[in-house]
Amino acid sequence: MVAGSPKTSKKTLPDLSYEDRIEGVVFGVDEVGRGPLAGPVMAGAVYLHREHIPEGINDSKKLTARRRHLLSDMLHNQADYATGMADVHEIDRINIRQASLLAMKRAVEALIQKIGREPDCILVDGRDIPDWPWPSLPIIKGDSLSLSIAAASIVAKVERDEIMVKASQEYPGYGWEHNMGYPTKEHREAIQRLKPTKFHRRSFSPIRQFYENVD
């Protein structure tokens, strides 16, 4: 683990304070989709190039869908990134925490393969670090502090949303095209009315309770 962290501030946007303390190649990693009742958990890994950093990068949750798509397109052209996913079956088998870490590891491995070198440090959103050999620094609320992590949250969110919108066409009625699988009132009521799909997480309470009541 890499020691040390910049002092906290009242800044409104993430910056390179953490990245500037580290020499060499720095990846930012974040995941999205821990809370939904349906769909995969997705992680992004981003290597920003200092001379080409899009303006306006922020925690994906603080951006509109339109802004996220715009920034994702810009990152596609101006940075190196990759995504990793753990599907519903993996979530149910190993639990959502472990599945999130697995998705992060897959994203990092994909980015290493893409750029042809390993990172000197990985900045990870949250408290947990996946089981990998690279020096890492966990940062609580990292997607609001580190540009690299914020960028990772954007690419992961955009890709996961696209998966959910596509899935909503196969399984209409659950509102996935706008709730992205999260437990909204509409989604919960649809589960009771239409029954869960193979895209739902059976280990999550509302889905598990549905099958317990059926049995």
UniProtKB/Swiss-Prot annotation:
GO biological process, one term: DNA replication, removal of RNA primer
Coiled-coil portions: none
Broadest EC class assigned to this enzyme: hydrolase
Entry note: cofactor: Manganese or magnesium. Binds 1 divalent metal ion per monomer in the absence of substrate. May bind a second metal ion after substrate binding.
Major subcellular location class: cytoplasm
UniProt keywords, alphabetically: Cytoplasm, Endonuclease, Hydrolase, Manganese, Metal-binding, Nuclease
Catalytic reactions of this protein: Endonucleolytic cleavage to 5'-phosphomonoester
SUPFAM superfamilies linked to this entry: Ribonuclease H-like
GO molecular function: manganese ion binding; RNA binding; RNA-DNA hybrid ribonuclease activity
Pfam families linked: RNase_HII
Entry's Gene Ontology cellular component terms: cytoplasm; ribonuclease H2 complex
The RNase H type-2 domain, residue ranges: 24-215
Localization per record: Cytoplasm
Manganese as UniProt keyword: yes
UniProt key word Transcription: no
InterPro entries assigned: RNase_HII, RNase_HII/HIII, RNase_HII/HIII_dom, RNaseH-like_sf, RNaseH_sf
Secretion signal, residue range per the UniProt entry: none
Enzyme Commission number(s) from the entry: 3.1.26.4
Binding site for a divalent metal cation: 30-31, 125
NCBIfam families, alphabetized: PRK00015.1-3
Protein family per UniProt: Belongs to the RNase HII family.
Function: Endonuclease that specifically degrades the RNA of RNA-DNA hybrids.
HAMAP family: RNase_HII_B (MF_00052_B)
Record-linked PANTHER family: RIBONUCLEASE H2 SUBUNIT A, RIBONUCLEASE HII
Name used for this protein in its record: Ribonuclease HII
Organism of origin: Zymomonas mobilis subsp. mobilis (strain ATCC 31821 / ZM4 / CP4)
Lineage, opening ranks: Bacteria, Pseudomonadati, Pseudomonadota, Alphaproteobacteria, Sphingomonadales
Protein's gene: rnhB
